[in-house]
Swiss-Prot record:
Keywords: Isomerase, tRNA processing. It is an enzyme of class 5 (isomerase). Transmembrane segments: none annotated. Residues 160-306 form the TRUD domain. GO terms for biological process: tRNA pseudouridine synthesis. InterPro entries: PsdUridine_synth_cat_dom_sf, PsdUridine_synth_TruD, PsdUridine_synth_TruD_CS, PsdUridine_synth_TruD_insert, TruD_catalytic, TruD_insert_sf, TruD_pseudoU_synthase. Responsible for synthesis of pseudouridine from uracil-13 in transfer RNAs. The keyword Lipid metabolism does not apply. This is tRNA pseudouridine synthase D. One of its GO terms (cellular component) is cytosol. One of its GO terms (molecular function) is tRNA pseudouridine(13) synthase activity. Belongs to the pseudouridine synthase TruD family. It catalyses: uridine(13) in tRNA = pseudouridine(13) in tRNA. It comes from Pseudomonas paraeruginosa (strain DSM 24068 / PA7) (Pseudomonas aeruginosa (strain PA7)).
Length: 355
């Protein structure tokens, strides 16, 4: 099986070659994520909400540990989104405990998991309920000209970056996409729910990245065209762009963006040349598109441009760059870093890593 690399799975950079190289995730504290949840919690109800800090632990394993400690089935443990294992992350979980007192969750805690806050609420935590994620990244072993770095950072703060799905979505060496293609060619869906979700997500993400890569290559990823479907940064609804909509000042303000397809049943609702491009993409991947439609996936949209909120940076040491920013839920910090620096594995200073 051939290993798929960064250009196979993502696409070209929008802002030119990387300004240099650095190491990310030398330790978990170098990649910190804080979930941003805009839900007022009532303090009462049959759902126990937990604000959890975890280190070197993925979200699914943390959920299993919390469920075991609470004595509840996994279906009664909820979280808004998956967070990286190789990171220090803080996120919410909820446990459904109707008629039960708060359980002793000490068995779930350890050096890699701490419960920072507990409160009650009337509803469970829904997937995708978080509004955003706040990131603090520490890039070490930095080799780059600071003047070039500062100029690039100012540029992406002003205009954003392509909203690619990150390499994490596709598994090691693109393995999730390889498996998705195999399932599509055989017209089957894995019985295991987690595998099914992982493969369907990889297939949709790849098609989106293909479309975005085309628009980055021609310089239209951040400009609206007649026939585009436009969406606001934090909205899942969209509307068709005519000539007047293409002149909307909110596009220049990075509040409104062109979108690309998350493939599902039926043709995309885009128009004009945009629809032609998206149908041509589907024609180049017929098995994958049929498979996604047959799986009952609804056709959705994702913004092509990723605005970076509150981007700040400094150099705590001569060879360390620290970044702080906020991204909408479902967006990848690594695609921001990719527009700035090449990442190299710990202990190396050559050859960009493939993850």
């Amino acid at each position: 099986m051939s290993v798929l690399g960064e250009l196979d799975l993502l696409g070209p950079r929008a802002h030119g070659a990387a300004c240099g190289e650095a190491v990310l995730k030398a330790v978990a504290e170098d990649f910190q994520v804080d979930e941003v949840l805009d839900i007022p919690l009532s303090g009462e109800g049959e759902h126990l909400w937990l604000w959890v800090e975890k280190r070197g632990l993925n979200t699914e394993e943390a959920a299993r540990r919390l469920g075991r400690a609470a004595g509840v089935q996994q279906k009664h443990v909820s979280y808004a989104g998956l967070k990286d294992r190789q990171a220090l992350t803080r996120q919410w979980f909820s446990l459904h405990l109707p008629g039960k007192a708060d359980p002793d969750l000490g068995a779930a805690e350890g050096e890699d998991l701490r419960i920072l806050r507990r409160t009650r609420h009337s509803r469970k935590l829904q997937r995708g309920a978080h509004a955003a994620n706040g990131f603090t990244l520490r890039l070490t072993a930095l080799r780059a000209e600071r003047v070039l770095l500062d100029a690039r950072l100012e540029r992406i703060a002003a205009v954003g970056v392509p909203n690619y799905f990150g390499l994490q979505r596709f598994g090691h060496g693109g393995g999730n996409l390889v498996d998705a293609r195999s399932c599509a060619e055989q017209d089957l869906l894995p019985a295991n729910r987690n595998l099914r979700s992982r493969f369907l997500s990889a297939g949709r993400s790849y098609l989106f990245n293909r479309l975005l890569a085309e628009r980055v290559a021609e310089g239209s990823w951040n400009r609206a065209a007649v026939g585009d479907l436009l969406a606001f940064t934090d909205s899942r609804s969209f509307f068709l762009a005519g000539e007047e909509e293409c002149r909307d000042a909110r596009l220049a303000a990075l509040d409104l963006h062109p979108t690309g397809p998350l493939w599902g049943e039926g043709d995309p609702p885009s128009g004009a040349g945009v629809l032609e491009r998206e149908l041509a993409l589907a024609g180049s991947e017929p098995a994958l598109c049929r498979w996604l439609a047959k799986a009952g996936m609804a056709h959705e949209r994702r913004i092509l441009r990723l605005p970076i909120q509150g981007l700040a940076w400094h150099y705590p040491e001569p060879d360390v760059l620290q970044l702080e920013f906020v991204l909408p839920a479902g967006c990848f910090a690594t695609v921001v870093v990719r527009e700035i620096l090449d990442l190299v594995p710990t202990g190396q200073t050559e050859n960009p890593c493939a993850y």
